[in-house]
Each structure stands twice: as structure tokens, then as C-alpha cells.
Amino acid sequence: METLSFPRYNIAEIVVHIRNKLLTGADGKNLSKSDFLPNPKPEVLYMIYMRALQLVYGVRLEHFYMMPVNIEVMYPHIMEGFLPVSNLFFHLDSFMPICRVNDFEIADILYPKANRTSRFLSGIINFIHFRETCLEKYEEFLLQNKSSVDKIQQLSNAHQEALMKLEKLNSVPVEEQEEFKQLKDDIQELQHLLNQDFRQKTTLLQERYTKMKSDFSEKTKHVNELKLSVVSLKEVQDSLKSKIVDSPEKLKNYKEKMKDTVQKLRSAREEVMEKYDIYRDSVDCLPSCQLEVQLYQKKSQDLADNREKLSSILKESLNLEGQIDSDSSELKKLKTEENSLIRLMTLKKERLATMQFKINKKQEDVKQYKRTMIEDCNKVQEKRDAVCEQVTAINQDIHKIKSGIQQLRDAEKREKLKSQEILVDLKSALEKYHEGIEKTTEECCTRIGGKTAELKRRMFKMPP
């Protein structure tokens, strides 16, 4: 029962919530912690439970003092003092499971305890909070639904108005019905005439199309025939050309012309060959002159290069002398720096040795600390294992207790069923007893009536 689905409040918080949610006026002001601690007051709990039932179910105060109608009671005056408690327990028995409390009993009303009552009241307060949030959401949903219903109503009204307008537009008034009929007849006649004209025109066009198609096919045939005739004529022309022979005079003139052209071509070829020989001789003379000129140019260029090299070597020698002087001064500086660095290195080595000694010492201290921590962790782990074993044992005990409680509840249910059966048997026995008493009373009455009648007869028969 410790893993519940609602928070457990302390007594101060319960008093504040009850003043704000359940009790109002003087009852809420008079409520205090002393009403719940050390022992809760039953009359205060009756008032709180009744107010919660009034808030949730709308149960009135007079309902708690009324006999239930669905139960037959032989002696109702005996139950008058116990009616409020029984009705309160009857309503709370159905209300507490809704608040996630499943172990509420009548002893919690008659002889309340502080821990159980605080749990019951915290469950009731949690349910009231949940109910208020649900009511707020439901009210928002109702407002949205109302606005949507109003919009739907407006849209339906607008739709109906539009339908009415459409009906008015579609419907023809009585005054214009005759004109509408005449116009309708005229339109039908015009449609009929137009259809006839369209059919006639379509038939004429189809006939023309068939004629054009036939003419086109004839023309294509004629064109194909002409093409065949042209091809045949070309073949005849080629055959005739091969058979034609030129005249001898034309052949002679043509040969003379060809000879003249050949002589002209030969003379032109000879001139070209002569010019080629002259050009080749001139080209052969050119390379020797060019070689001499190139040699002179190379020598002059080598002299210029040598001059430039000499000037550059002189400059380099001067630069090297300056560099040698600067390097000698730098060497002196470097020697002094080297001596200072050697001194620094010795100092740093000494410092490193001291630091290494300190580091080794710290490492040893850390190792020792780790060993102690591991030992402590092992001890804690052992304690944790022991606690886990205790927790498992406690959980097993709780499980056993829960199973025992369940068994007790089952036994209680069985005893309740047995008591109900006994009550039914007692009721039936009482009814039989009452029936026997009624029968005996009736028999006694009949006997007494008979005896009184006999006595009366005897009295009347006796002489005076």
C-alpha cells in the first residue's frame, strides 16, 4: 500500500486543503490539527466525508438519516441510531476505490487512526483536485462545442436561405408561366430546326469529302504513271547518248587544242625549274655567312657575360667579408649564450630531480590512498550486500504479509457470505415463526369464538 498513485499530505496541508475545498464558514475556521492528532475525532471526519460526498455525488444530509428502500427490515426502529454511519459507509465504500483507496473499512469511521485517515483524506483531496481540472477542461470543451454548434446553426441557416433563393430563382412565377411556356416551345422548335440544318450540312460535307477523296486517289494514280514514264524516258535517253558518235573535224580541233595546252604547260614547268635552281644556289650560299655572324655574336655575348660575372663575384666577395665580420661577432655572442644556457640546464636538472622526487612521493601517497579507498569500497559493498539481503528478506516478508492479508480478506468474504446466509436463514426462521404465531393466534381466536358461541348457546338454553 506504500506505492500509491497520489501524494501523501501532512496534517497541516490537509487542514489547508479542507478549508479551501470542502469546509466553509465556521466549520472551516474551527478546524485545526488537534482534530486529527493524536487521535482523529469521529464527528469531524463524519462532517468531512459527508461534505465530500455532497460535493461529488450531490448527496443531501437527509439521505444519511433515511432507511434504504431496497432492503426489508423487520424492526426499523432498532437501526435509527446506526443509520447515518451505515449510509455513510455504504456511500464511502463505492467512493474510496475511485480515490485509489481499496482498504477502507467501517472501523475507519467508528475508530479512526491518524495514519490511515491522513492517507484517506489525501486520496480524497487528490481526487477533488483531479475533478476540478477535469471540470475546467470539460467547461472549455463545452464552450468550444457551443461555439461550433452556433457556427453550424448559422451555416445551416445560411444554407437554408441559399436553398430558398435557389428555389425562387429556379421556380417561375404564375404570371410569367405562360410566357415561359411559349419561350420554351419556341426554343424547342429552334433546336429542332437547327438539328435538321446541321444534319443536312453534315450529309453534304460528307458527300463532298467522298468526292474529293476519290479525285485525290485518281490524281495520285496519274502522278505515279507519269513518274514511271519519266523513268523509262531517262533510260532511253542514256541508251541514246551512248550510241551518239562525234564528227572527225571536231575531234581534230579538240586534239590540236590539247597539244597547245600541253606545250604551254611544259614551257611553264621549265621556267619554274630554272627559278628553283637559282633559288637553291642562293640558299646554299647563305648558311656559311650566317655561321660567321652567329660566331661573332656568341663571342660578344660571352664577353658581356664574363664582365657581369666579374662584377657579381666582386660584390659577393665584399658581402662575404662583411658576413665574416658579423658571424665572428655572433659567434662570440653565441658562446656567451651557450655558457648561460649550460648554467640554466644544470639548474633545471636539479629542479627536475627535486620535482621527480616529489612526484614519486605523491604517487606513493596516491597509491596508498587508492588502497584505503578500495578497502573502504569493499567494506561498503559488503555492507550493501548485507542490506540488500535484508531488503530482499523484508520484501519476502511483505509479500508473505500481503498474501496473508489477502487470505484474511478472502476468509472475511467467506465469513460475510456465511453470515449473510445465516441472516437469510434467521429471517426465514423468523418469518416461519411469525407465520406459526399468526396461525396459532388465528386458531386460538377461532377456538375462543367457538367456545364463546357454545357458552352463549348454553346460556340461552339454560332455564330462567
UniProtKB/Swiss-Prot annotation:
Its main location: nucleus. Residues 386-464 are annotated as: Interaction with the C-terminus of NDC80 and the SPBC24-SPBC25 subcomplex. Residues 148-201, 249-372, 413-443 form a coiled coil. Keywords: Acetylation, Cell cycle, Cell division, Centromere, Chromosome, Coiled coil, Kinetochore, Mitosis, Nucleus, Phosphoprotein. It comes from the Eukaryota. It is found in: Nucleus; Chromosome, Centromere, Kinetochore. The modification Phosphoserine is found at residues 171, 247. GO terms for cellular component: cytosol; Ndc80 complex; nucleoplasm; outer kinetochore. GO terms for molecular function: microtubule binding; protein-containing complex binding. Can be phosphorylated by AURKA and AURKB. Residues 1-385 are annotated as: Interaction with the N-terminus of NDC80. Component of the NDC80 complex, which consists of NDC80/HEC1, CDCA1, SPBC24 and SPBC25. The NDC80 complex is formed by two subcomplexes composed of NDC80/HEC1-CDCA1 and SPBC24-SPBC25. Each subcomplex is formed by parallel interactions through the coiled-coil domains of individual subunits. Formation of a tetrameric complex is mediated by interactions between the C-terminal regions of both subunits of the NDC80/HEC1-CDCA1 subcomplex and the N-terminal regions of both subunits of the SPBC24-SPBC25 complex. Belongs to the NUF2 family. This is Kinetochore protein Nuf2. It comes from Rattus norvegicus (Rat). The lineage of its organism: Eukaryota, Metazoa, Chordata, Craniata, Vertebrata.
